[in-house]
Regions:
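Catalytic beta-strand/loop module used to bind and position nucleotide/cofactor moieties
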Residues: 3-8, 20, 26, 106, ...
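N-terminal lobe of the biotin/lipoate ligase/transferase fold
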Residues: 2-166, 188
Length: 329
């Protein structure tokens, strides 16, 4: 606890030195305890400058995820009141599924520094190198008809756009139905999965998973993924603090949970505004083969309306097709 108080004080005074005596007084601990906390923070990767007769100043935050900071922020919130962080895991969605079997996970958040089996829609793999992305899943149990839960993927896309914009000052676009895009490349993938009670067959929870590319470079993505993927560091020239981004994502998900499903019109308006697929030629890949058309709009239930080459129209749902832009990503 002392370490977190010292860090909080240093973060509040980054433009000036804070004396050991002042920290000791405000934290209610001894000077020796302050020194010990500073050394612990340095070992975790924080840059802390110390000058005799002036004190301490925070010069760099650690690149590591800091789950203790997140836990402190969200202990009284619907989402994040239980927050678990793993160094390495197969998949944050999978971990929530395992926990759902043994009891309620409503509001639980799983974070990981690395995923060895990250995945997206239709079983596709999601490259999740250690320390380079934000890999997060949350479990929700909304009180609404099951028919409305299908819109949560689109709602989540809007919420994540809000989070990235708040931290980075740039708003991604949305590639229907579940990708965030910057500079015509994939920045983030979203995977929502429903879980059911094993014995009763009743709805248990919906798991929302998100993977945001934060500091990857081309080598991290690999030759197959690099041409269609981008990280915030590549797009902006610098990577945001992952813990700050995680906090904003969880905050946006809490707002989503509070709004769902009553504020559907507001989220629909945002989704229509942010969707980059509309107005562009697309290739639709389904079990029946491939078709070429033009995306003409988003329906009231977040479906994609398409005009085919023969002039006919159709509204697609997220579960039945894969949509690829004909140009770039």
């Amino acid at each position: 606890m002392t370490k977190q108080i010292v860090l909080k004080l240093l973060r509040e005074h980054t433009e000036e030195f804070l004396s050991g005596e002042a920290i000791s007084r405000q934290a209610g601990v001894s000077r020796a305890a302050v020194w010990k906390a500073v050394e612990q923070l340095r070992q975790e990767g924080y840059g802390i400058e110390s000058v005799p007769n002036r004190g301490y100043r925070l010069t760099r935050v650690t690149a590591r995820l800091r789950p203790e900071e997140l836990a402190e922020q969200f202990r009284d919130c619907r989402i994040g009141r239980e927050l678990l962080c793993f160094d390495t895991i197969d998949s944050t969605n999978n971990e929530l599924k395992r926990r759902a079997v043994s009891g309620s996970v409503d509001g639980t958040v799983i974070l990981a520094d690395q995923q060895t089996g990250g995945r997206g829609r239709r079983g596709r793999s999601f490259v999740s190198p250690a320390g380079k992305g934000l890999y997060l899943s949350a479990a929700l149990r909304p009180q609404c008809p099951l028919s409305e839960i299908s819109t949560l993927t689109a709602w989540t896309a809007v919420a994540l756009c809000d989070a990235v914009e708040a931290v980075c000052g740039v708003r991604p676009g949305i590639k229907w139905p579940n990708d965030l895009v910057l500079n015509r490349k994939k920045l983030c993938g979203i995977l929502t999965e429903l879980e059911w009670e094993a014995e009763s067959g009743e709805f248990s929870c919906v798991i929302i998973g998100a993977g945001i590319n934060v500091s990857q470079d081309e080598a991290d993505f690999g030759p197959e993924v690099a041409p269609i993927a981008i990280s915030l560091a590549q797009a902006l020239g610098t990577a945001p603090d992952r813990t700050e981004l995680a906090a904003r994502v969880i905050r946006s998900l809490n707002a989503l949970y509070d709004d769902f499903p009553a504020q559907n019109a507001a989220y629909l308006e945002c989704f229509r505004r942010d969707c980059l697929t509309v107005g562009n030629p697309i290739k639709v890949i389904s079990g029946a083969g491939e078709r070429i058309g033009t995306a003409t709009g988003i329906s009231d239930d977040f479906g994609l309306t398409v005009r085919w080459e023969d002039g006919s129209t159709e509204t697609l749902t997220s579960g039945e097709v894969s949509v690829r832009g004909l140009y770039d990503y």
